C-alpha cells in the first residue's frame, strides 16, 4: 500500500474490505467487476433518458468542454452508448498521447472495438467491453496521483426535507466513520481500485460522522460527529466538531453546548472556520434553526462570528488567495428557491461579497476553485437538498449568467425549487487537477453513494463503493499549499463604537439612464431584523416552529396581494424552467416584464436605521452599525425609492468598505475620479427616521397617519370604500393592512416560493408603482394633505416591502402580547 504523500505513516488500524451486500438483482455477478458493470449500466441508462428541455441540457444548448473551446457537449449527447464511449476513448487517447504516454496498445484496442461496433451495434456486451477499455486508460493519467489516498466519510444518507434542515429533520442513522481509501497502482502504473484498501481513522458507528477535511500539512483531520446518544441527559443530540490524527490516534471533541457545529475548514493562520447554530436564530421561510459561518482556535476556544446572515450557510472552503468560499442563503425581497448562492469572505469576517449566482434559477453548493483555471466547480443543488449535477462556472462570463454554467454530468437534470432526488445524482466535487474531480455519486435507482473520479469531458469512473453504506465527501489526503494570511486592519475608533464605514463613489453608476443625475438625494440603510430563538428551560434552544407561517412578521398564509408587474433586463427570467409562479414577457426595447402572482409581502421584520445625503457628484460616505444584516435603498427628495439592494451586506467592527455604485457591473473597473465630494468631509452618521430606528411596525408607524387623514371617510361604513381602520380581524390583521395589500393598492416584490429570478430596473416597483399614491393625486382626495413626515411613513412601509409586525411572536399569542396603545381587536 502507498504511504501518504505527506510522508506521515499510515495508521495501524485494521484494514476492511467491503462485503458485497447489494441485492443480487442489481449485479451481473457478485464481484468487484460486477459492481463496476452495475455503475456502467446505470450511466448508460441515465444518458439515454437525458432531458431535452432543460436549459442546461446539451440537447437544447451546446457548450464547450473548456472555456473558449469548440462546441462539445451537444454532439456527445446525441451518440448511442457505444458511440459515445468510443468517442471518449479516442479523445482520451489523444489527450494522454499529448502528455507523452505510450498509447499504441489502446489505439489497437480502439480499432478492434470499432470493428465490433459495425457488426454488433449498441449491444450490452460491446458497451461493457468498450467501457472497461476506456476505464483502464483513464486510470493511467498521471494527473490522478492525488486520488491514491482519499479521505472520505461512510454514512447513511440524511434525506432532509430542505437543503437547510439536515440538523432538524434529516435521518441520522448510526453507522460508518471517517475513512481513508488507499488505491495502489498496478504493474503498468495505473490506479487499481480493484485492490484498494479502506482504513478507518474514526469509528462513527455509535452516531454519524460527516464532512472530513485535512489540515494543510495532511496530518490532522477535522470533521463533525453527532452521537446517537445525547451528550447531556434530556437534550437532543448535536453535531460537534472533532479532530483525529491521520495515524488514527488523538481523537477528541473540540466543541460542546446546545449548538450544531459542522463543516470545518482549516484557516491559513491555524484556526478553524466552521458552520454553527450559535447565532440562535431561525431560518426564515420554514421551521429550523439557522446556521452561519464562525471561526475559532483549533482547541475550540475564542469562538467568533464571521457572518451575520439571518438564514443558513454551509460548506466553506479556502480559495488560493486566502478567502473563504461558501454557500449563503438570502431572500432579501425575492423568492426563496434560487437564493442559495456562492459568496466569499475574508477569514476575519470582513468584505463578504457575491461570487456567483444571484438572479439565476439554480442554487449552488460545494463550490471549489479549479486548479490552473479561473473556473469554479460546484453542485447545482435545489431548495430541497444538496445534490444535483456537477457544473463548471466560467466566471469570465459574469456573476449572474447561466451561460457561465456547463454541466459535466448532463445526464443528471438540475432540480428546481423544492424538487429533490436521492438517486442518479451527484454531490461534493473536489478538484484534483484542472480536468479531474473526485465526487460522490448515487448511480442507480437506489439512493446509494460511491466515490467516483470524473472529468470535464464527461468521463466517470467508480473508485470505491461499499454495498453496505454510502460513501461521501471524498478529498485527497495529502499536503497542500497554505493560502496567504490576509492582513486585518480594523479602525480602532470605529470598532470601539460598534461601527464600520461605507463609501459609495457614485450612486448613479449602474442605474443606467432611468435615473437622471440630481434626482437621488438620500441613501437609506435598512435592516433585516433577526428572528432569535426561544431559550427553553432545559437550556436548549427551540428547534422547530410549526406551523411556521404563524411565526412570520407578516402572516402571508392569511393575507396577500395581487399580481405585480416589474421590469427587468435579466434574461434568466425567460429560461426553460418550470417556474411555479408568474410569467415573463419580452418587450420591444430589450427589457422583460415579469408578472409576480404570489402576492407575498415581506415575512421578515424590517427596520429603517437611517438615511444619509447623496452628494451632488453621487458620492456617499457614512458610518453604520456592525454586526447587522443591512441593505441600501436609494431615495429621491420625496423619499420615494428609486432602486433597492435586493441582497445583504454587513460590517465587522471597525471595517471600512467601499463600492463603485448601485447595481454596477462588478467585473468592470470603476471610473477614475478625483476625490469625491463625500470624502472631503467626515463620514456622516445615520439620521434615524422620525419614528425611530427600531423594527418597523405598521400599527405603530403607519396606522396613526391613516387614522388622522383617512379613517374619517374610510371607516368601514361603505363597502365600496377601503376600510382603513386599525381594527383587527380574526387573523389579527388590521383592516387597513388587509385592504391596502389584498386590494392591490401597494406594489412590492413577491417573497413566494417558485418565483422567477431577476434584477429589477430602477423605479419599476414600490412606492412609484403603487396605486395608493395615484389615488391620492386624484381630485376626490384634493383635501387630503399629508405632511412630509406622514407621507414618509407610507413610503417607508411600502418600500420596506410592506411588513406588518416588528417581531416574530407566535401569531395566536399576539393578542395577549399586544400593548394596549395599539389598535383594538375586533369583537367576535
Segments (PLM) and residue ranges:
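Aromatic- and Gly/Pro-enriched helix-to-coil junctions and flexible linker segments
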Residues: 1, 12-77, 108-115, 125-132, ...
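Residue position within the beta-strands of beta-propeller blades
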Residues: 151-153, 159, 220-224, 272-277, ...
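Long amphipathic alpha-helical scaffold segments
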Residues: 97-200, 206
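Residue-level detector of Asp-centered blade-edge/turn motifs that repeat once per structural unit
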Residues: 145-146, 216-217, 267-269, 319-321, ...
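Multi-bladed beta-propeller domains
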Residues: 187-207, 245-260, 297-311, 346-363, ...
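Loop/turn-rich, solvent-exposed surfaces of beta-rich toroidal or solenoidal domains
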Residues: 365-453
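Asp-box/WD-like beta-propeller blade repeats and closely related beta-sheet repeat scaffolds
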Residues: 229, 235-295, 301-314
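Structural motif
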Residues: 175-177, 231-242, 282-292, 334-343, ...
Amino acid at each position: 500500500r502507498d504511504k501518504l504523500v505527506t510522508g506521515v505513516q499510515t495508521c495501524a488500524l485494521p484494514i476492511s474490505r467491503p462485503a458485497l451486500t447489494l441485492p443480487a438483482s442489481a449485479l451481473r455477478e457478485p464481484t468487484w467487476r460486477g459492481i463496476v458493470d452495475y455503475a456502467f449500466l446505470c450511466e448508460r441508462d441515465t444518458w439515454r433518458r437525458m432531458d431535452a428541455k432543460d436549459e442546461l441540457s446539451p440537447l437544447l444548448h451546446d457548450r464547450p468542454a473548456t472555456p473558449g473551446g469548440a462546441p462539445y457537449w451537444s454532439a456527445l449527447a446525441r451518440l448511442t452508448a457505444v458511440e459515445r464511449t468510443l468517442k471518449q476513448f479516442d479523445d482520451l487517447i489523444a489527450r494522454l498521447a499529448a502528455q507523452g504516454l505510450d498509447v499504441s496498445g489502446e489505439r489497437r484496442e480502439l480499432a478492434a472495438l470499432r470493428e465490433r461496433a459495425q457488426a454488433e451495434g449498441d449491444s450490452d456486451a460491446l458497451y461493457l467491453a468498450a467501457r472497461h477499455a476506456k476505464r483502464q486508460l483513464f486510470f493511467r493519467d498521471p494527473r490522478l496521483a492525488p486520488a491514491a489516498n482519499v479521505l472520505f466519510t461512510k454514512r447513511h444518507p440524511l434525506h432532509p426535507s430542505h437543503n437547510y434542515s439536515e440538523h432538524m429533520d434529516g435521518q441520522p442513522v448510526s453507522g460508518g466513520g471517517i475513512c481513508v481509501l488507499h488505491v495502489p497502482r498496478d504493474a503498468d502504473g495505473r490506479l487499481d481500485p480493484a485492490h484498494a484498501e479502506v482504513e478507518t481513522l474514526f469509528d462513527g458507528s455509535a452516531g454519524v460522522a460527516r464532512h472530513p477535511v485535512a489540515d494543510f500539512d495532511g496530518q490532522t483531520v477535522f470533521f463533525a460527529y453527532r452521537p446517537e446518544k445525547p451528550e447531556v441527559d434530556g437534550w437532543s443530540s448535536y453535531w460537534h466538531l472533532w479532530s483525529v490524527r491521520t495515524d488514527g490516534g488523538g481523537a477528541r471533541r473540540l466543541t460542546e453546548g446546545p449548538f450544531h457545529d459542522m463543516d470545518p475548514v482549516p484557516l491559513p493562520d491555524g484556526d478553524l472556520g466552521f458552520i454553527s447554530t450559535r447565532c440562535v436564530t431561525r431560518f426564515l421561510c420554514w421551521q429550523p434553526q439557522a446556521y452561519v459561518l464562525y471561526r475559532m482556535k483549533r482547541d475550540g476556544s475564542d469562538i467568533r462570528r464571521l457572518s451575520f446572515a439571518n438564514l443558513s450557510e454551509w460548506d466553506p472552503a479556502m480559495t488560493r488567495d486566502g478567502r473563504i468560499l461558501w454557500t449563503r442563503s438570502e431572500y432579501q425581497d425575492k423568492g426563496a428557491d434560487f437564493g442559495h448562492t456562492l459568496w466569499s469572505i475574508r477569514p476575519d469576517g470582513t468584505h463578504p461579497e457575491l461570487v456567483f449566482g444571484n438572479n439565476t434559477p439554480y442554487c449552488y453548493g460545494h463550490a471549489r476553485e479549479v486548479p490552473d483555471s479561473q473556473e469554479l466547480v460546484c453542485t447545482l443543488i435545489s431548495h430541497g437538498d444538496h445534490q444535483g449535477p456537477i457544473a463548471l462556472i466560467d466566471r469570465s462570463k459574469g456573476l449572474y449568467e447561466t451561460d457561465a454554467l456547463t454541466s459535466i454530468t448532463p445526464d443528471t437534470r438540475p432540480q428546481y425549487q423544492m424538487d429533490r432526488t436521492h438517486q442518479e445524482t451527484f454531490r461534493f466535487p473536489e478538484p484534483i487537477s484542472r480536468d479531474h474531480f473526485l465526487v460522490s455519486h448515487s448511480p442507480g435507482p437506489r439512493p446509494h453513494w460511491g466515490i467516483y473520479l470524473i472529468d470535464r469531458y464527461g468521463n466517470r469512473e467508480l473508485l470505491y463503493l461499499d454495498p453496505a453504506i454510502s460513501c461521501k465527501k471524498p478529498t485527497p489526503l495529502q499536503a497542500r499549499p497554505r493560502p496567504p494570511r490576509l492582513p486585518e486592519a480594523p479602525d480602532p475608533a470605529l470598532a470601539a463604537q460598534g461601527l464600520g464605514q461605507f463609501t459609495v463613489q457614485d450612486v448613479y453608476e449602474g442605474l443606467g439612464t432611468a435615473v437622471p443625475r440630481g434626482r437621488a438625494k438620500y441613501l437609506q440603510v435598512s435592516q433585516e431584523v433577526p428572528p432569535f430563538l426561544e431559550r427553553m428551560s432545559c437550556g436548549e434552544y427551540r428547534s422547530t416552529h410549526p406551523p411556521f407561517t404563524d411565526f412570520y412578521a407578516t402572516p402571508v398564509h392569511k393575507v396577500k396581494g395581487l399580481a405585480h408587474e416589474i421590469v427587468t433586463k435579466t434574461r434568466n427570467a425567460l429560461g426553460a424552467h418550470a417556474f411555479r409562479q408568474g410569467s415573463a414577457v419580452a418587450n420591444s426595447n430589450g427589457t422583460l416584464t415579469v408578472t409576480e402572482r404570489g402576492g407575498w409581502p415581506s415575512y421578515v421584520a424590517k427596520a429603517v436605521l437611517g438615511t444619509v445625503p447623496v452628494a451632488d457628484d453621487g458620492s456617499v460616505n457614512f458610518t453604520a452599525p456592525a454586526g447587522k444584516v443591512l441593505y441600501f435603498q436609494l431615495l429621491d427628495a420625496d423619499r420615494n425609492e428609486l432602486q433597492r439592494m435586493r441582497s445583504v451586506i454587513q460590517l465587522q467592527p471597525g471595517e471600512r468598505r467601499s463600492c463603485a455604485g448601485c447595481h454596477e457591473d462588478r467585473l468592470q473597473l470603476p471610473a477614475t475620479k478625483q476625490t469625491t465630494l463625500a470624502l472631503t468631509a467626515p463620514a456622516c452618521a445615520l439620521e434615524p427616521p422620525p419614528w425611530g430606528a427600531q423594527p418597523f411596525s405598521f400599527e405603530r408607524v403607519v396606522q396613526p397617519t391613516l387614522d388622522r387623514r383617512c379613517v374619517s371617510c374610510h371607516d368601514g361604513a361603505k363597502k365600496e370604500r377601503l376600510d382603513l381602520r386599525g381594527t383587527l380581524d380574526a387573523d389579527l390583521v388590521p383592516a387597513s393592512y388587509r385592504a391596502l395589500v389584498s386590494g392591490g393598492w401597494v406594489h412590492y416584490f413577491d417573497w413566494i416560493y417558485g418565483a422567477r429570478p431577476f434584477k429589477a430596473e430602477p423605479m419599476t416597483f414600490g412606492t412609484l408603482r403603487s396605486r395608493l399614491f395615484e389615488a391620492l393625486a386624484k381630485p376626490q382626495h384634493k383635501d387630503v394633505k399629508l405632511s412630509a413626515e406622514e407621507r414618509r411613513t407610507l413610503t417607508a412601509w411600502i418600500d420596506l416591502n410592506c411588513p406588518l409586525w416588528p417581531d416574530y411572536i407566535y401569531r395566536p399569542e399576539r393578542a395577549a402580547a399586544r400593548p394596549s396603545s395599539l389598535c383594538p381587536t375586533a369583537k367576535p
